Amino acid sequence: MDNKLRNTIFVLFLCLSFSVRAQLKDYPIQGVTFTQVKLDDKFWLPRIETNHKVTIPASFARCEETGRVKNFDMAAAKSGKFCTVYPFDDTDIYKTIEGASFSLSLYPDKKLSQYIDTLIMKVAAAQEPDGYLYTARTINPSAPHEWAGPERWILERDKSHELYNSGHLYEAAVAHFLATGQRNLLDIAIRNADLVCSVFGPGSDKRHVAPGHQVVEMGLVKMYRITGKKEYLATAKYFLEQRGHHPYDAKSNNPWMNGSYWQDHKPVVDQDEAIGHAVRAGYQYAAMADVAALTGDEKFLKAIDAIWNNVVSKKIYVQGGVGALGDGERFGDNYYLPNESAYNETCAAIANVYWNHRMFMLHGDSKYIDILEKSLYNGLISGVGMDGKSFFYTNVLEVKNSSHDQHQESSRSGWFTCSCCPTNITRLIPSVPGYMYAQQGDKLYVNLFASSKSKVTINKKNVEVIQSNNYPWDGDLKFSINPASSLPFSLMIRIPGWAQQQAIPSDLYTFSNPSSSKASLTLNGKPVEYKIEKGYAVLTRTWKKGDVVSVNLPMDVQRVVANANVKDDAGRVAIQRGPLVYCAEWPDNSGRTANIILPQGIALKPELKKDLLNGVVVLTGDAAAVTVDALGTTISTVKQPIVAIPYYAWAHRGKGEMTVWFPEKVTSVDLNSK
C-alpha cells in the first residue's frame, strides 16, 4: 500500500471518527494512532518486525494446518464435520487478520494482502444469507457442535460463543478497512452486526442475553465509530446492561452457579470487584469504558473506577499479570496471589492493556499508563518467545524442581488446542506505537518511551516529535519538538510511578528502600521548572523548531515488598529496575533458583549483556544459597553470585527453575525443592 492510499485511509478514519464524535460524547483524550508513529528503537521495532515476518505467517499456517480454515470451507459447502475442538476457533482467523491488517499499515505486503483477501472470500462464502456467521453450526445445522445448542443463540450465555465470534469479526473488519480501504470484510461484519441488532435488544419481540464471553461489546463500539450506526452503540450498551438479571443461586460459592464466572452476578453498574474469568472481565471493563465515554453514563464510570482500584490494590501480580486461578482462568480472592500456581493468562494481560488505556483516556492520569506499562513490558511480552512462534498461555512467577501444578508451563509451545493467546499476540504487538502519545486540545501526552519519529496535529498545525533513547535499559530520554511554525501548547511527559518511588499506584507493592533519586528535566540544555499534574511533567510554552527536552529517569535497582495480606510473598522480595521486573533463572545460577536468598543490604548492579537473550541488562551481585545434605539432616548456607534477567526473557534456554520472589531469610526457603 503506497503512502497516498495510507494517508487517504487515515483521513477517512478521522472523518468517520469526527462524525461520530459530533453525534455523541467521546473520550476527552484521544490516542494518537500507531500509523503516525514510526519506531526506530531496539526493543519494540524488532518485535513488531518479527510479528510481521514470523508470528503472523505462523499463525495463519496453524489455522490452515489445524482445520480452522477448513471449517469455513465446509460451512460454505454446508457439508462435512466441524474439525477443530472449540466453536470459537473461528476467532483465531479473525484475530490474525486483525493483526495482519495492523501490520500491513506498517509494512505493505502484497502477498500477505492477497492471502487475507482469499481468507475473506472463504469467510464470505460461509456467511448465511441473513448475516449469521458461525461455522460450528452452519456446516451441519442438524448436528451442530455440542456447545452450539439445537438452535441459534440458545446457549449463548453458557458456551456457544456466537457473539464472541461476532465481536472478533467486527474488530478484524474495522482494522482491515482502516489498513486497506477495502470493504470486503467490513460488509460481512455489517451484515452480521445488523442481524445481531435485530435479534437482541429491549422489547418482547427480541432475545435477551448477557453474552457468554464479552468482546462483542467492544466490537460493536468499533463498528459504530466506523459506520455511525447508532444501533451498534445502543446494542453494546444493552448487552452490558443485561448482566446481573439471570436467576442464579446467589448463595452458592460455585462461580458457575452464582454467575460470577461470567460477571453476571450483579448489574455491571453495581459491580465493584474484579471477579470471574479474567479475560471476560477485562473485555467487559474496556467496553464499559467505551460506553461511558460515548454515552456519558456516569454509572458505568463509577463502577469501573471501583473495579480498577480493586485490581490494582488487591489482585494484580508484580509483573502485571491478572487472573490468579487456573480453575476457570479466574481472579482469586483479594490478596490471593500465589506464585507457583499463578495462572496469569496472556490474553488477560492484553485485556488489561486495552482497559487501562481506556481508563487513561477517560481520566488523564498517568497511573493507568503505569499499569499498562507494567503489563506490557513484563507479564504480556513474556507470552511470546523471541523467535516469534512460541507462546505461553499462562505466565507463572515461580518454577521449582518440585513443582507439580497442573497449569504450570515451564516452556513455551508453538500452538494450543485453545489458541486464543498466540492469535491475540499478533494483534497486540503491532499496535504498541498507538499507546505512546495522546492528545486533548492543546495538550500532547507522552505516555511510553521508544526511539521514534511521530507526526501530530495541534490546533491545525503539524508537529514532529522525535524521541531518542535506549529505553527500557536507560532512563535518559530526549525529545526533539519541531512544529511547522511557532506554536503554543503543553507537552505532558509522563514521569512513571517507579521513577517517583512508587512501585504501583496502591499499597499492594512498595519499594522497601526507596531511592532519593528524582527525575530531572532540561529544556534546550538548561534546567527548567515544571509542575506535575496527574503524574505528568507539564511544559507549557510556545514551541519552535529545534526545541529539545531532556528527561532523566532514575533507574535504581529497587527491592519490592508485597502487602502483608499477600501471604505467598511474606518474607520475600522482588527486584525491579525501571519498568522491568526481574527473575533468576537456572542457567545463570548454578542450575537452581529456589534455594537463593536475598538478605537485606545485598546490592545488585546493572550490566549490559549484548549477546544474551537478544541483548538485556542483567542484575548481578552476591547473594546466598541454601543447600541440604543428602540425608536431609544438615542445612548450610553458602555465598553465591546471583544473576537476574528481565522476567519477560525467561524460558529461552531450556526447562529449569525460575524465581521472581526471593526469600530474605533461610526460614522462608522451601527446603523440599531439590
Task: Name these PLM-found stretches.
Residues 1-24:
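Bacterial Sec-dependent N-terminal signal peptides
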Residues 23-110, 114, 144-179, 214-231, ...:
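Aromatic (Trp/Tyr) and acidic
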Residues 47-79, 116-132, 187-204, 235-251, ...:
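Long, well-ordered core segments of solenoidal/helical folds
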Residues 139-160, 170, 186-211:
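Asp-box/WD-like beta-propeller blade repeats and closely related beta-sheet repeat scaffolds
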Residues 200, 212-253, 271:
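Solenoidal tandem-repeat scaffolds enriched in leucines and small polar residues
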Residues 236, 304, 370-378, 383-480, ...:
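C-terminal beta-rich recognition modules with glycine/proline-rich loops and embedded aromatic residues
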Residues 257-261, 315-334:
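Flexible glycine/proline-rich, aromatic-decorated loop/lid segments
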